[in-house]
Design a protein with these regions (language model features):
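Hydrophobic, Leu/Ile/Phe/Ala-enriched alpha-helical segments that form helix-helix packing faces
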Residues: 87-95, 139-147, 212, 216
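N-terminal carbohydrate-binding/catalytic regions of secreted carbohydrate-active enzymes
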Residues: 22-138
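Post-HEXXH active-site segment of zinc metalloproteases
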Residues: 221-225
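Positively charged n-region of N-terminal signal peptides that target proteins for export
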Residues: 1-4
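Sec/Tat signal peptide C-region and signal peptidase I cleavage site
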Residues: 17-19
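Bacterial N-terminal signal peptides
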Residues: 6-15
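Long, well-ordered early-domain segments
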Residues: 127-157
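Active-site-proximal segment of zinc-dependent metalloprotease catalytic domains
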Residues: 145-219
Length: 225
């Protein structure tokens, strides 16, 4: 009896490993542009170094055709002037529509960016110096679903007191931003970008825009990358 059970177990492990290895999510992507969250899901990151230049390829997945960016500044420490500085830099760094239409983006006349707001975590929220991706998703569940939710990408800027964790990777040291999505209780996919804190507003916005564009052209991990 032991041998059949062992064979079944080995087959199960092999099947699981095969499924992970052949998952269409970010399959064939540059390894340095991928991290794994605490739910064993691969996500696309902006690494803290330049990647080899290569033309993105299309993998058959969805694109956010009429994207809207909603900037959220989490927690304390975000003065109004600082928020305005990052907001302005984000708009200035956004690629023109001409460079996005080739990927199927149809925003007109440009990508809409909603004025940044300060966002306070729920009462009793505790952290351990950083946030995992699943903890961030739990906080984002509190956002009411708007009429353009399917086209909305929330861009979450973390405070200096919070880091972000993707498995063993730490925000700032191992990645400058990342994007992901999850099935919201409000229905549909809630798409978001997470941007760990940086003192330079220009560099902060630049990393945010890079990840936002990735979230638009590659929301499911099967689009352009």
């Amino acid at each position: 009896m032991m041998k059949p059970l062992m064979a079944i177990a080995l087959c199960g492990l092999a099947a699981s490993g095969w499924a992970q290895a052949t998952s269409p999510v970010l399959h064939g992507a540059e390894p340095a542009s991928v991290a794994v969250n605490d739910d064993d899901w691969r996500v696309e990151i902006v690494p803290p170094f330049a990647l080899p230049s290569r033309e993105p390829g299309y993998h058959g997945g969805a694109v956010v055709e009429r994207p809207r960016a909603v900037l959220l500044f989490m927690g304390e420490g975000w003065a109004g002037a600082r928020v305005s500085e990052v907001h302005s830099a984000f708009i200035a760094d956004m690629p023109g529509l001409g460079s996005l239409t080739r990927y199927g983006v149809r925003a007109h006349p440009s990508v809409h960016v909603q004025r940044g707001t300060i966002w306070t975590p729920e009462n009793g929220f505790a952290h351990h110096g950083g946030l995992t991706d699943l903890e961030i998703q739990a906080q984002l569940e509190r956002i009411p679903s708007g009429p353009s939710a399917k086209d909305t990408v929330y861009v979450l800027f973390l405070p200096e007191s919070h880091s972000a964790f993707l498995g063993e990777k730490v925000g700032g040291a191992d990645f400058l931003a990342y994007h992901n999505q999850f099935g919201s209780r409000h229905g549909g996919q809630l798409r978001y970008v997470v941007v760990p804190y940086r003192h330079d507003a220009g560099q902060l916005a630049q990393a945010a825009v890079r990840s936002f564009v990735q979230a638009v052209v590659n929301p499911d991990g099967t689009g352009w990358y």
